Amino acid sequence: MKKKSFFAVTMSITLLLTLLAGCSDPGAGSGGGPSGGDSAGQTGGEASRLKVAWICDGVLTDGGWNTNGYEGMQKLAEEYDLEVSYQENVPQTDVGDVLRNYASEGYDMVLSNEQYHCEPMVEVAADFPNVTFGCVNAYVSAENMIAFSGTLWQHNYLAGVMSGMVTKSNKLGLITFSTDSDSALTYLSSFRAGAQSVNPDIEVVHVATGSFSDLAAGKEMATSLIDQGCDVVYCNSGDCNATVMELCIERGVYTISAIVDRNGMSDEYVLGSTVNLPSTQLRMMVEGKLSGTHTGNVTPIVGGIEDGIEAFLVNESLQDKLDASVFEAIDEATAEIIAGNVTVELP
Amino acid sequence: MPVSLLDTTLGMAVRMSTPYLFAALGGLLAQRSGVYNFALEGMMLGGAYFGYFFTLLTGNLLLGILGAVIFGLLSGWLLAFISIRFGVSQMVVGLGMNTLFMGLTSFCSRLLSNSRDGSALNLDRLIGNIISGPAAEIPVIGSVLCSQNLMTYLIIALFVFYAWFTRRTEYGLALRAVGENPAASQTAGINVFRYRYLSVIISGALAALGGAYLTLTQVSRFSENMTNGRGWIAIAAICLGRWSPAGTFFSCLLFGLASAASNQIQVLNIGIPYQFALMVPYILAILALVSIQGKSSHGPAALGKPYMKNR
Amino acid sequence: MHNQKLKAFLRKRSFLITGGMALIAILLAMLVGGVLIMLIGIDPILAYRYFFYGAFGNIYGFGETINKFTPLLCCALGFSIAQKSGFFNLGGEGQFYAGALCAALAAANMGSASPIVGIALPVLAGIVGGAVLSSIAGALKILFNANELLSTMMLNYIMQYLIALLVSGALKNPNSSMEQTVPIPDPVRLPALMEGSRLHAGFFIALAALLLVWFLHQRTVLGFEMRLSGMNPKSARYAGVNERRSLIIVILVSGALAGLGGALELQGNQYKLMSGFSNNFGFDGIGIAVMGQYTPAGIFLSTLLFAALRVGTGSMQRGVGVPTPILYILQGVIIISVIVSNYFVRRIKDSLVEGRDA
């Protein structure tokens, strides 16, 4: 027994030392970051390859926002032969560290999928003038940072218009992660403004899940809304979105998909999808950098439905099921928004 | 069609308490034998994932349930083996297993979602309600008793069985004895280890079923860390129920009601910040701990104390 | 005989046995992790090289590791001191938040104070904040005999929602869209110690706390009473120990340490409070205390390990795309194997003692 344990101790120490020896730069050779050289397995290739880092808050498998950004990056990597590294689950507290890490490891571009990462990103960008940063839906920016943003209200406004046209109970339900953050309040005010523009009596019930992953709780939240008479339920809370939509379809009330196009889930109850794809903005950033035409803008470039940054995709299969006035109202509102005649009071 | 507030709340309360009921019965059984199962949270998460995974794989809900049960039995065995055989801190083992299963289920769900595209990750079919039609329309009774699925009826039956078993059968009395005084039980010829092992192993299966309830009856997919603290609430329910089956049962219902109320507070829009609404179950749990003060039962006497055979 | 010499050698240096077992636990975790990494088609050796490079191999990474070290150490100490007296404080997470909250409130009003006072008062406020939160669980325990495992756990959830409420409401920075407080003023921040790294003075405050706790425990009467009532409440009572008094002190100190962690993290690293401010520091503290066997040296080393795990797994993902849940798998396996190894350590030590008797 004792002999064995001593042997084990010695063995472990030896092994640990061997591992510590591995502490050296795994991509050694070129002297850059860990993936600077060919030895880093998946990398390799010419020096001219653009090295792009992409980070997100939350998990890659949220089936919406982050999944779309991740897939968009994979597609770009293939198309333009980029070397892409990613890190998920980057909480607000660590954003600065992670961004600095990438910038110092020799990445040419450091992108974030998360709106709220833009404030720390501006600080980091000042220290790395040779790196191009980029943040989806950013509201602040820097000289070496590419910042696009949707208006974050136009597509929701249109969803509100459609909901306002189809509701019979004049009660709409909105589910978000919290009910008092700026982004949640933007959702509420634009969705409500759209609905009330066609029917001033409409009431929007706004509730929070407090979780992106507690699917059962999200579903019960939607149950509450439906039971209280909401006949359109719109959910934007991570993983819960698809679950809430399934419930709505089962219960026979209208629903709207947030972030990605899920119009195919039902040809009867999904009114449409409010789409604001991170992949669209990420593509604009990477292509701008590659062509050298765009490597930074101090003021974020805000684009709406006209620019294709965001969109409300009406479910085509409803064309012959709903009254034509519904679609006319949407077209009219779209035209009004593009003409600049619509304003929504935002937080 | 609007449903009455009472019906919504009560039906929801039963649905939300069912996972608590499974996990709490598992925890109760283990604690009766003298072993804390603090890994309930992780075991539920594992049950949720593996129940979902095997259903997705085979297209058969029964096999999915079986998968969850097998995971539960294995994880229960691991907990039993470590905490009984080695006599180490049951709390620490439980916490370690929670961490491990959280990582494992998230990791596995990554593997799964990498291998399929998004739409192929949904289960086609869930375990539905068995009673439908006019019966489900009766006020209160309809929403509480009839609009529920098979697993809810199963756990109610299991609670009744547990109550009968621990009070009326020789084995049940022996189980209680093991939890109260293992040394004396051993002297009386009861195999302490066998009772403890079996209790903890079954406890794992029950917790896993509680998790599987979420993915196989409520939502058709798995999400990382989707149990969101339900295992801990279950442990609080055992305490509040003072280790009696009826007490635990009603405590779970109470927590279910609190979760439902937390939803309804928001929907009714009475101006309470949502964070307070979400705190309700946890505040209730603390009040519950206070309210059991000074009452006769403090759980099995040998609870949490490792028992090692005299060498 | 050789065997006898070995026994005598190990008897004198029993830390070698404990340490060896801990190493085995780490290796086991790495083995499990390695197999899983292999399963997703990534070269585990390369992944682990990224791990070590990320955590120790470069100045930024090492700075990050040290950055995580300070809050983790405080939380581990808080859990450890309570655990030794038989109080299971799972509330490190909530107490960490309470500390950060009080420090933030104090710091916001420190604009014109002298540097020493400006830094010290918020730290003290943090300590008090943590102690206040743990005293709630303590009062419930002492007055109502309420299970502290549950009450501290539930207080964690309540505290998290409370912080979410405050940073999006009363304490929200009006100039930012983010749900966070106004950054604390410069004079209140803990000074950075090294150019090019984020190492701040909080590191030494945490180390001082470690030494202080050790001193309190091993060299004072109060510490003796704490240990005695943890090991054997009955004999403590016979020995005339005021059990209730020593329990109250333990509970307060335990919460205070986690609160200190929150204050140091706020003043040394993040400068503003937000939801998710504590990235599981409180819970990791438990694993660290277990792994470190509740000894000062052990806790020091395991804090380093857990900090490195966080940074290293991030580096593995950046380098070769290993999913982050691997962190929890590694931590879980380490905690479980360390706790199991305690059994073997005890057996080995027993057999060594028997060897002497024979």
Where are the predicted features?
Chain A
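C-terminal motif of bacterial Sec signal peptides marking the signal peptidase cleavage site
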Residues: 18-22
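Bacterial N-terminal signal peptides that target proteins for export
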Residues: 1-11
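Hydrophobic alpha-helical membrane-embedded or membrane-associated segments
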Residues: 13-16
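A residue-level marker of the well-folded mature domains of exported/periplasmic proteins
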Residues: 23-347
